[in-house]
From Swiss-Prot:
Keywords: Acyltransferase, Transferase
Membership in a protein family: Belongs to the acetyltransferase family. GNA1 subfamily.
Record field: catalytic activity: D-glucosamine 6-phosphate + acetyl-CoA = N-acetyl-D-glucosamine 6-phosphate + CoA + H(+)
Species whose genome carries this gene: Drosophila melanogaster
EC number of this enzyme: 2.3.1.4
Residue positions binding substrate: 64, 111-114, 123-125, 154-155, 186
Protein name per Swiss-Prot or TrEMBL: Probable glucosamine 6-phosphate N-acetyltransferase
Alphabetized PANTHER family for the sequence: GLUCOSAMINE 6-PHOSPHATE N-ACETYLTRANSFERASE
Gene transcribed to yield this protein: Gnpnat
Length: 219
């Protein structure tokens, strides 16, 4: 394994410390949050440029086809996402194994409507098969949903399978009438991203969207 001496976050990890999990309708038993994920060896954080070596792409392959992405391609896409400021890929790490075990992406869409508001999309949600039952599905979705609110999104949208509608309803999402399996959660409208989300070198960023949400667990 290549030894990496310097690591870069996709966005400012301090944003996650601001999230108030008591604002979510999710029912955690026991209560957990991004700051306290339930186990001392778990850490919720932004994606790092070194996560290529922590199995991030292998985890995504449990969700959908990833392809043969080499290190250079990974780092190039990471840099593009960071530079754009509109991608907030968030992961859960098992620090005992130095392995990524959960992930979800918030993609920011900039609008002219609603006074040039910003909207969030929840995408690429996945939890390692062997870690089911630890509420990690709820944890990663609620983390990214609260992050969207923190960043000033007026709403967050997702697409899901039939069997996951109840799961997302339990987290505050509602089905969009006449729009198949699209769901949304609305926040107080905010016209722009908060300044701390786009501050120097610590923000996430824009690019093309990937696969939408597809979870295969019920917790």
């Amino acid at each position: 394994m290549v030894q990496l001496t310097e690591e870069t976050y996709l966005y400012d990890p301090n944003l996650l410390l601001k999230l108030d999990f008591h604002r979510s309708p999710a029912n955690f038993k026991p209560f957990i949050s991004a700051a306290n994920p339930g186990e001392p060896w778990m850490k919720v954080r932004p994606l790092k440029d070194t996560d290529y070596d922590r199995g991030f792409l292998q985890l995504l392959s449990q969700l959908t086809h990833v392809g043969n992405v080499n290190r250079t391609q990974f780092l190039t896409r990471f840099s593009q996402m960071k530079a754009s400021g509109d991608y907030f890929v968030t992961v859960i790490e098992d620090t005992r194994k130095n392995e990524i075990i959960g992930a979800a992406s918030l993609v920011i869409e900039r609008k002219f409507i609603h006074n040039c508001a910003v909207r969030g999309r929840l995408e690429d949600v996945v939890v390692n098969d062997t870690y089911r039952g630890k509420q990690l599905g709820k944890l990663i979705v609620v983390t990214v949903s609260l992050l969207a609110e923190e960043l000033g999104c007026y709403k967050m949208s997702l697409d899901c399978k039939d069997k996951l509608i109840k799961f997302y309803e339990s987290l505050g999402y509602v089905a969009i009438p006449g729009n198949s399996n699209s769901m949304t959660i609305r926040y107080d409208e905010g016209p722009t991203l908060k300044r701390n989300a786009t501050s120097a070198g610590s923000s996430g960023t824009v690019g093309d969207s990937c696969q939408t949400v597809s979870l295969d667990f019920a917790s």
